[in-house]
From Swiss-Prot:
It is found in: Cytoplasm. Its EC number is 1.1.1.79, 1.1.1.81. The keyword Metal-binding does not apply. Keywords: Cytoplasm, NAD, NADP, Oxidoreductase. CDD domains: GDH_like_2. PANTHER family: 2-HACID_DH_C DOMAIN-CONTAINING PROTEIN (PTHR43333), D-ISOMER SPECIFIC 2-HYDROXYACID DEHYDROGENASE NAD-BINDING DOMAIN-CONTAINING PROTEIN (PTHR43333:SF1). GO terms for cellular component: cytoplasm. The gene is ghrA. It comes from Citrobacter koseri (strain ATCC BAA-895 / CDC 4225-83 / SGSC4696). InterPro entries: D-isomer_DH_CS, D-isomer_DH_NAD-bd, GhrA_Enterobacterales, NAD(P)-bd_dom_sf. This is Glyoxylate/hydroxypyruvate reductase A. Belongs to the D-isomer specific 2-hydroxyacid dehydrogenase family. GhrA subfamily. Signal peptide: none annotated. Pfam families: 2-Hacid_dh_C.
Length: 312
């Protein structure tokens, strides 16, 4: 079995060694320009067109949960990868727990009004504030995939009303499900905390705009853990300045690194992190890849295959 590996920033030596231990008998090599030797599998992140073009691969693994970058390249260069070759994304591989940590900590931060207390502290003001009603602090999750399910599961322990919105209806215990464009308004109008975990597709680019934000409850919060292109940043700022939104926590942006001139940096009710909500955990990723390749070699069913039409 021949496996090619390419990632512009990962520790290639570590990955080659770990994969060799996890898949005994496989010949695993780093792909470099000019390498036209046969391969069965390709493990990639932002691969050059020439790496995959014309190859008769059994499968390609994107080394992350998001596949928008490789799908964009495939759209521009359809000759890069034959449509019959399955493309897989990393399923969870430690990202679920990271998303749970991030989402739960931020929802509790807002629920306990730590943002307000920080503002009072900056004014040297000692002032206890009324508590929020837990039953009125509805958390809505946009995007009901693997990570959305993990976040909903973690939030259940805290007793908040939970709802989700996605293309198709879900049957998650304790979570009210909304599906399709016709139910988006109903999903939004009682949501106090909106968590975005949507995939990056043509349909979801710019979806968080003034039209959507104005349907939320007054004084709502936005937590964006998906992609920066989902959010119209001008509309977000307008919603914050009008106090339609009370706050926003952003891990992703339409341009990264965020330009220094962006008003988001200085806005008093915007908090941010540099796209670190959930990163690839190498050991978990190697385990997932090795197990999936083993199942594929045996002709067994697997999960994690990307629908190239839907984009996730």
């Amino acid at each position: 079995m021949e496996i090619m590996f390419y990632h512009p920033t990962f520790d290639t030596a570590w990955w080659l060694n770990a994969l060799a231990k996890a898949i005994p008998g496989a010949n695993i090599r780093e792909w470099k320009p000019g390498d036209n030797e046969p391969a069965d599998y390709a493990l990639v992140w932002h691969p050059p067109v020439e790496m995959l073009e014309g190859r008769k691969l059994k499968a390609v693994f994107a080394l992350g949960a998001g596949v928008d970058s490789i799908l964009s390249k495939l759209k521009a260069h359809p000759e890069m990868l034959d449509a019959s070759i399955p493309l897989f994304r990393l399923e969870d591989t430690g990202m679920g727990l990271q998303m749970q940590e991030y989402a739960v900590s931020q929802v509790l931060h807002w629920f306990r009004r730590f943002d307000d207390y920080q503002a009072l502290k900056n004014q040297s003001t000692w002032q206890p504030l009324p508590e929020y009603d837990r039953d009125e602090f509805t958390v809505g999750i946009m995007g009901a995939g693997v990570l959305g399910a993990k976040v909903a599961e973690a939030l259940q322990a805290w007793g908040f009303p939970l709802r989700c919105w996605s293309r198709s209806r879900k049957s998650w215990p304790g979570v009210e499900s909304f599906a399709g464009a016709e139910e988006l308004g109903a999903f939004l109008n009682q949501t106090r905390v909106l968590i975005n975990l949507l995939p990056n597709t043509a349909e979801t680019v710019g979806i968080i705009n003034s039209g959507l934000l104005n349907q939320l409850r007054d004084g709502a919060y936005l937590l964006n853990l998906a992609r920066g292109v989902h959010v119209n940043e001008d509309d977000l700022l307008a919603a914050l300045n009008s106090e339609k939104l009370k706050g926003a926590m952003l891990d992703v942006f339409s341009r990264e690194p965020l330009p220094k001139e962006s008003p988001l940096w200085q806005h008093p009710r915007v908090a941010m992190t540099p796209h670190i909500a959930a990163v690839t955990r190498p050991a978990e990723a190697v385990d997932y890849i090795s197990r999936t390749i083993t199942h594929l070699e045996r002709g067994e069913s697997v999960t994690g295959q990307v629908d190239r039409v839907r984009g996730y």
